[in-house]
From Swiss-Prot:
Protein name as annotated: Uncharacterized transporter YcgH
Transmembrane segments: 20-40, 42-62, 95-115, 127-147, 160-180, 205-225, 237-257, 284-304, 331-351, 355-375, 388-408, 414-434
One annotated GO biological process: amino acid transport
Record membrane topology: Multi-pass membrane protein
InterPro entries: AA-permease/SLC12A_dom (IPR004841)
Disulfide topology: none
Length: 446
């Protein structure tokens, strides 16, 4: 079983370090690239989308932090689901998260490999994907300390890059930089702020939520805090920082060029600076995109490997994935993660582009389903009152709005149904698991 608060080893992580790790695990291709899709869908109202998504994410993390403070668990949200609703909830939650993260790692590998191919066009995509996959696994192999330091350093680099864009954008708006003959594009009417109406805001909301994906890793890391009750403080700092720099940077990008200039294929930061003769800066940003994608890739690998070991402890995964006493790494768990990575790379290269995109959309949605279960678990285990209960219900409404918005967009609708298909498969496996557990628990006939 998972460790209880009494026998939980004391952590050595300060709350601000968890905040920094959270930034490292969150700022990735979901923001640097995914925000362009949100802009295309929503226009200027994308700023409202990011504010809504930031608030919703904060409400979810606040509940996860309360659970972590009450009883730190290695399995985090999976352990809390098990406590709240039984073995089936822990089992299904774990495998929903594992499946979604492995699919997401495939898209992350593809994205950072494409960025690298910009500099080395002759090298096949799979070569870069393989190199980044091995590097990511090496960081996980070296242990928790190296993972923490890596995410801290990459978090600083990514945050500095966003601040660099903000400074450059302000200089451009002030006319200090040469080029960029588009003028400043400020929406003067409601119809200009909502160019695609309420439906545009609705369908773009899901991509704003994707930019905040990563709080689950903070939940898994919260057990290493010196004071688990400070998890809430680290989440507040991290999410407030992200929401502010996200909204300011995207707002500046929108002011620099006309809306029709943005495309789903290019980062809004590259699009907005293209006319300013800043080739070196654009190359620097290409490098930042690689760092950002690699950072979130490593976070995903850490999460799935750690969670797999914990699930094995709880009987929700084969016992061979249990971390042996005195060992720092579970080789079978790392091996399965490697196998999942290889499969993700193959799928991204072999499957038709639209089918693979539907699968990665489904993976992002499944991550939000995990967030919903965090809310359900908190409602049952913490018995919230007043503002706590209001936060839970508001977060549920906001997540439901983001998920349902995919049904009204032709490109994302198939991803919703693919996510439901994955849930059905995992539900069937869960029922088989429950049945087998029932047979094990049943006393033998005399």
């Amino acid at each position: 079983m998972s460790q209880t608060k009494k026998d939980q080893p004391k952590g050595n992580l300060a709350w601000w370090q968890l905040s920094l790790i959270g930034v490292g695990c969150t700022i990735g291709t979901g923001f640097f690239l995914g925000s362009s899709i949100a802009i295309v869908k929503s226009g200027f109202s994308v700023l409202l989308s990011f504010l809504i998504a930031g608030i919703g994410t904060y409400f979810v993390f606040e509940q996860l932090a309360k659970l972590s403070a009450k009883q730190p668990e290695k399995g985090s949200f999976c352990a809390y689901a098990r406590k709240a609703f039984g073995k089936w909830a822990g089992f299904s939650n774990g495998w929903v998260y594992w499946t979604s993260e492995m699919l997401i790692t495939g898209s992350q590998l593809t994205a950072i490999s494409l960025f690298t191919k910009h500099w080395f066009p002759q090298v096949p995509l799979w070569v870069f994907a393989s190199i980044y996959a091995v590097l990511g696994l090496l960081i996980i192999f070296t242990g928790l300390s190296v993972f923490e330091k890596t995410e801290n350093v990459l978090a600083v680099i990514k945050t500095a890059a966003i601040f660099m864009f903000i400074v450059i954008a302000i200089l451009a708006l002030c006319g200090i930089l040469s080029g960029g003959n588009h003028g400043i594009h400020v929406p003067n009417k409601t119809s200009e702020f909502f160019p695609y109406g309420a439906m545009g805001l609705w369908t773009g909301l899901i991509y704003a939520f994707y930019a905040f994906g990563g709080i689950e890793v903070m939940g898994l890391m919260a057990v290493h805090l010196k004071k688990p009750e400070e998890a809430s403080k680290s989440g507040k700092l991290m999410l407030a920082t992200l929401a502010i720099i996200y909204i300011i940077s995207i707002g500046l990008a929108l002011l620099l060029v006309p809306l029709h200039t943005f495309t789903e294929q290019d980062s809004p930061f590259i699009t907005s600076l293209k006319g300013y003769n800043l080739e070196i800066i654009l190359d620097i940003f290409n490098g930042i995109f690689i760092i950002a994608g690699f950072s979130t890739l490593v976070a995903s690998l850490f999460a799935v490997t750690t969670l797999l070991c914990t699930m094995a402890d709880d009987g929700d995964a084969p016992k061979c994935f249990t971390l042996k006493e005195g060992k720092k790494i579970c080789w079978p768990a790392l091996g399965l993660t490697f196998a999942g990575l290889v499969l993700s790379i193959i799928l991204s290269l072999v499957l038709p582009k639209n089918i693979y995109e539907h699968m990665t959309t489904a993976a992002g949605l499944m991550l939000l389903y995990t967030w919903l279960f965090i809310l359900f678990s908190s409602k049952k285990l913490t018995d919230p009152e007043g503002m706590g209960k209001t936060q839970i219900y508001l977060a549920m409404v906001l997540i439901a709005a983001a998920v349902s918005g995919t049904l009204f967009e032709k490109s994302s609708r198939p991803g919703f149904f693919v996510s439901i298909g994955f849930l059905v498969i995992i539900a069937i496996v869960t029922m088989i698991y429950q049945k087998k557990q029932g047979h094990k628990d049943r006393p033998a006939s005399p």
